[in-house]
Amino acid sequence: MAGSLSEIKAKIISTEKTSKITSAMRMVSSAKLVKSEQAARDFQIYASKIRQITTDLLKSELTIGSDNPMLVSRPVKKTGYIVITSDKGLVGGYNSKILKSVMDMITEYHADGDYEIISIGSVGSDFFKARGMNVAFELRGLADQPSFEQVRQIISQSVDMFVNEIFDELYVCYNHHVNSLTSQVRVQQMLPISDLVADEAAEEGVTGFELEPNRQDILDQLLPQFTESLIYGAIIDAKTAEHAAGMTAMQTATDNAKNVINDLTIQYNRARQAAITQEITEIVAGANALE
């Protein structure tokens, strides 16, 4: 019985230590979430402005006849997917949701292997490589609040692959942050731009522009910036969802640990009571034997 009591007590102590660790990790994820949400709000100011300018430009007559490849829709022979996952685990179903969605799309639409994956996050990279899938580029070790400089190269590589007709459409696949408890899988088209904002442009009237130095130079500078802002915004959004998922997962782990501690404490008290009862019974039996 003494052995049983000591084993239960050891489990209680071990679970309490685990609970303290998961509680601390929840607090860290919570702090990261607050920073990411603020970063997303700050970036949205820039993103909305550049989107408005691009949409106004596309609904004007100034883009008619432009040969900028980012505006050109062409027959789709191959599709590019930027897939954003985390670099670590302990984020609940964050990674499994997006990976399942990507696998479903590839199974349904790309049985012939007519796709390229640009992977952001170690979990996704390892997942795709283990299955022998087409990973063109990858980025590991993304910061908790990634700067544009950190992701500039892989974004530029993705855009260049479209411009050079390695693939004919570009999508970004990620978890969109809704709130601290909820995220939604998003598969959002990035290129060609003409498809992306055509509906928005059609809803409003024509805007007049006078551009300096000339139309083509403006388009050549604006369109890459616009696309890069969309992809970077998706990365910030995905990171925010990741921190929220980590916070929720650690809160769940902490709650589960507390439930285990309560159950073990009840077991310990019952075992201790049984041990005391047995000792009393043995003492009484011994006293009766002496009479």
Curated annotation (Swiss-Prot):
UniProt keyword Magnesium, yes or no: no
Similarity field: Belongs to the ATPase gamma chain family.
Record function comment: Produces ATP from ADP in the presence of a proton gradient across the membrane. The gamma chain is believed to be important in regulating ATPase activity and the flow of protons through the CF(0) complex.
Underlying gene: atpG
The name this protein goes by in its record: ATP synthase gamma chain
Keywords, in A-Z order: ATP synthesis, Cell membrane, CF(1), Hydrogen ion transport, Ion transport, Membrane, Transport
Topology term for the membrane: Peripheral membrane protein
Highest taxon of the lineage: Bacteria
Assembly description: F-type ATPases have 2 components, CF(1) - the catalytic core - and CF(0) - the membrane proton channel. CF(1) has five subunits: alpha(3), beta(3), gamma(1), delta(1), epsilon(1). CF(0) has three main subunits: a, b and c.
Lineage: Bacteria, Bacillati, Bacillota, Bacilli, Lactobacillales
GO function terms (MF aspect): ATP binding; proton-transporting ATP synthase activity, rotational mechanism
GO biological process: proton motive force-driven plasma membrane ATP synthesis
Alphabetized Gene3D superfamilies for the sequence: 3.40.1380.10, ATP synthase, gamma subunit, helix hairpin domain
Transport found in the keyword field: yes
Subcellular localization: Cell membrane
Pfam families membership: ATP-synt (PF00231)
GO CC terms, sorted: plasma membrane; proton-transporting ATP synthase complex
